Amino acid sequence: MKFKQIAFIFFLLIGYTLLAQDQIDYKADKIKFVKNYKGGAKRLIGHVQFTTKDGMYMTCDSSYFLDNNNIEAYSNIFIRQGDSLTITGKNAHYNGTTKLGLIDGNVVCTEKDMVLTTTVLNFDSKNKTASYQVGGTIVSKENTLTSKHGYYHSPTKTVSFKYDVKLVNPDYTMLADTLKYVTSTKTVIFLGPTNVLSKKDKLYCEQGWYNTQTQISHLTKKAAIYTGKNILYADSIHYDKKNESGNAYSNIRMIDTVQKTIISGNHSYSNKKTGIMWVTNNALLTKIMGKDSLFATADSMFAYEKKIKRLKMTLADSINHIEKDTTITKDEKDKKRLKIVKDTLNYIEKDSSTIKAYHHVKIFKTDVQGLADTMIFSAYDSTLTLYHLPVMWHKVNQLTGKLITVFFSNNKMDKIYIPENTFIISQIDTAHFNQIKGKLLWGYFKDDTLRKIDIVGNAQAVYYLQNDKKKLQGVNLIESSKLTVNEKKGTLNQITFHKKPIAKILPMKDLNVKEIEIKGFSWQDYKKPKSKADLFKKDTKIEITK
């Protein structure tokens, strides 16, 4: 919508309206003086015409022309200014003393390709204002604007629309309570609830502005942007449409409704061209998982949106046809197979998001907690991976390794993977700990509980033996190439060793627990986040497990 052109219509009305001129020429089929009408007036009847030196022209069926250029015009009002502006209506009134006037009755103002229609159009030539207060519509080549009130103030070069404002454009629809346009700065100001709807996104705010020249907008007060599956909330959003980039400030929440994730913080930057967004200042990731949620904090978080191609092959029918053809030699069959594979490779594009968290990463869930320097959450394969000195706690168990990856299925933990330097510790009391160390770990969850663990490669275990009353009886020291641990009554305590384990049992008497600790033992429970609030407490240095 060309707000500047709208302002120009109003400006012509109040600055050059024929009714406001000091010198007016007139003629009609019949002119007479009516003495008893408002102290005396000229009565003009039939083909009435008024003209001014600057080219304004008005016609009507009849009129009263009083002193001080007071004019009352009736029926078939037509006003023309220059070659571009015309106004039609039923009646027109102007008071030369107060400088107030109006045109009523199906008023139509046309300026080039823009048309303003209303029932009553008011103007004040002294204060240089024009308005309608009973509803109006402005139609241009590609836009239609409607509102209950419209107002133009010439001294400030401001045009305003209020109540049920609606702007319809081929690219978007704008719904607002109040809009102002300042012609000097070419800026649209939003006052009150405002929605901007397009095919790609929806924008909402209750205060803000948009510069039509620079295409930069600033949204405040309940600012929100809805884009596909994503929603962005913030106290304020500053957006550059040309560069498709923006910043958000204070109480930021970016919601992915498909992946059920929320990234929050107090400062963010996003760029649609690169598909990147970052959040800092109390950055928090919330992963909604049924009745529970997983929370993660870091110094900064980055979100990436990109399309990933997945391979789809439909080979079965064609290959079966080749196998059934016994007249084809083996070499010919192999060549045909290769051709079929090449010809039938189909790629399906799928939207995927990745969230990366850097430095001082902390995780809290009711039954899982964690620490690391870096975290990556991938929506493509539904994984959460901790890098650089990761520590994870699951109920009574502490897990460490070179990196830790958790796989999700249907928003529940499904598997856990540690490729190297696996170490599991579970506390029995303040002095005694069950310990398992090995190279590679695969763990399996059921109902968010770790039910089974397989450790492959140089497996070692320190496992305390207890009687029915939980009293320690001794300790089992075992080495094996592979071991399996199963859950029983909420704890991982059923250990199965494979391929000729080496084992010995030591009694508790005179046992030195430090001497039997597996190399790299490091119990870090004091660092474990005990609540969501702990995620924002000052960090303690993460220890290295070798």
Regions found by a protein language model. Name each.
Residues A20-K546:
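N-terminal amphipathic/hydrophobic interface segments
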Residues M1-D25, T545-K546:
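Bacterial Sec-dependent N-terminal signal peptides
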